[in-house]
Regions:
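Metal-dependent phosphoesterase core characteristic of DEDDh/y 3'-5' exonuclease domains
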Residues: 1-123
Length: 123
């Protein structure tokens, strides 16, 4: 597995582990393939998290996502996760030009909203 990863991402700590519920995959790799874990970046791309956000924030995008048919077979799961991530990338993260000014404006707005304190009542 490590040789395969190195063919595409030879530099250590650059390749991301990605997939659906990828935390479980990471635990398996930690227990059984520590050299693979050592080569991977520490961050994960969990397609399930993106799916959950789409379900809550972009319901139509969630409802139109490609249907899975893999039956929880390893290769089918991998290919369907790639397909699902590509779908969400195109629908939720379009490649429209985003200016730094717009990004700064949104960042200011979000910061101005503040972070609610735990136990604080909503008005």
């Amino acid at each position: 597995v490590l040789d395969y990863i190195r063919r595409f991402v030879p530099i250590p700590k650059k390749a991301l582990l990605a997939g659906n519920s990828v935390g479980t995959d990471k635990m398996f790799l930690e227990a059984n393939m520590p050299l693979v874990i050592d080569h991977l970046h520490y961050r994960l791309v969990d397609v399930s998290s993106i799916k959950e956000l789409a379900k809550r924030w972009y319901r139509k995008a969630f409802e139109e996502a490609p249907v899975k048919h893999g039956g929880h077979r390893a290769l089918a799961d991998i290919l369907e996760s790639i397909q699902e991530l590509e779908y969400y990338r195109r629908v939720l993260f379009p490649r429209e030009p985003i200016t730094r000014e717009h990004a700064r404006e949104v960042a200011r707005e979000v910061v101005e909203l503040g972070i609610p304190k735990i136990g604080e009542e909503e008005n």
